[in-house]
Amino acid sequence: LQTYTADTITLDNDKIEFMADSTSVWAGMRLYDLYKQAYTPWEWHEELFRVAKEEGLICFSSPFDKTAVDFLESLDNPIYKIASFEITDIPLIEYAAKKMKPMVMSTGIATEEDIQLAVDTCRAAGNDDITLLKCTSSYPAPIEEANLCMIKDLAERYGVKSGLSDHTIGSVSAVVAVTQGATMIEKHFIIDRSIGGPDASFSMNEQEFAQMVKDIRMAEAAIGSVSYELTDKMKSGREFSRSLYVAEDMKAGEVITEQNVRSVRPGFGLHPKYLKDILGKKVNQDLEKGTRFAWEFVNS
């Protein structure tokens, strides 16, 4: 959720700097009017938290000022999410961090210094449970600007967990983010895009969201772990690897060549790496085509 009112996030003002960017989907709107249209009524929060709990979901919110933090504390809000445009609001970050709840911070418009200051502020407040979200603050965000390799770097550079706040259309970015180490995915949700709304164009409906979750779980399973140990299934598959076999009927004393002993499937014969060692030597017995080649067939 997002917990704000138009008055806690901006000023009721007609100056040009209080207008939405001309390149955004909200071009021409006053920020005050946009936020007045987009905000979630605070009186809805209690019921949303209650229903989420009944459904086994974790409900939490982004506060946009200290009054929102105080209000959310009354609902036992379990996590605080700092939006991209609030990452420079150090007093807000400090106030929320002191509640000693996990802190999630989006980095859409943040410089490296902004991020470091926000992380340091949390830690100075005694709160080290921090997740940084890679975010592209365009609505919708072009997928070629997702820059998902940042997810891994955020975790390593700042010593935190990392994830993705995704404003691209579709689920590709979210699935790829998991392969980059994302531990959290934020995606806008809408029941029906046809009803419209400030974020309708880049929100997912129920079916799309469910499919995204399935795809993410499959991606997590596909990542696996670094291991060169063969599973039982892989070991059985080695039966179909290459090995040395007698390719022509051979008589005792016949010289081994690349024509009469070859590296072929299946894998029950001598390892192919030994072919160069046996070429030019003689076999010590008659051998039938299709015989697994072994050291014991070579004259000593």
Task: Report each predicted region and the residues it spans.
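Catalytic cores and adjacent flexible loops of soluble metabolic enzymes
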Residues: L1-S300
